[in-house]
Amino acid sequence: MQHLRFLHYIDAVARCGSIRAAAEKLHVASSAVNRRVQDVEAELGTPIFERLPRGVRLTAAGELFLGYARRRQADLDQVRSQIEDLGGVRRGQVTLAASQALAPAFLPQAIHEFQTLRPGIAFDVKVLDRERAACAITDFEADLGLIFNPPDLRGLTVLAQARQRTCAMVAPDHPLAGRASMRLKDCLAYPMALPDSSLSGRSVLEDLFEQSSAQPHPPLVSNSYEMMRGYAREAGGVSFQIEIGAGPSAGAVAIPIDERRLPTGRLVLVALRDRVLPVAAAAFAEFVGARLKEANQDGE
């Protein structure tokens, strides 16, 4: 499969934006990578990279060829996975792009439980904002995406989804910690840590505050849920998290927000449209899909 290695070279150059950087990443000589690029351009009869003073940039023809190269590599990964499964070898890797809200609790637990069933499966998890997570799927950088409030689903297939309510996160010794639920106005008396606009949870909270006519003045805004949770714990304040990501956490208690017509967010499991997933990724998609279905039923 020597020709697929050449396609891998092209993909690396496109991702790095430089022949030299791609060669360093691939641990080969720059001349070897440049030669493969030139071979492809000669065969196609057109440049696939525009040479710039610092690096290279894909041409329109290069964009088309890169899509072909990535589809070929994805097809090969899927075939390899199926062959291993036929032989009774339960190995493989799942590459997942996920929203940050799922990183502290839900994903570690789900992956661990899945690996107890299929211990040969390894995971490569990329925690990204929702726009980059969607792009990781379409760019063949990830098999699956688990994204909260995705901005655009063009080119993607929704495999499973769940509506998500908002929870307040407080320290175990916080005055609100013993409540079964709470109103948003109850939070205003305490320092609040809110997500910044790069996190999809911010738009849900803005809708929630607008609905309740609350005017928050947060002393901390961050793009990190761990930072917000840690600050709230130290300051005796409140941070926020979607319910599926608000599982048991060291030093934090989750309390559901109880508001009329409470705005909810949408958590979706997605894959590239028309792509046949590798066996390991398909199995994990089925496993997580069942978890999301349970979350929907629990929220009804």
What are these regions (language model features)?
Residues 11-29:
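Short helix-boundary/capping micro-motifs
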Residues 91-154, 221-224:
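Central regulatory/effector-binding core of bacterial HTH transcription factors
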Residues 191-212, 277-287, 292-299:
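Secondary-structure junction motif
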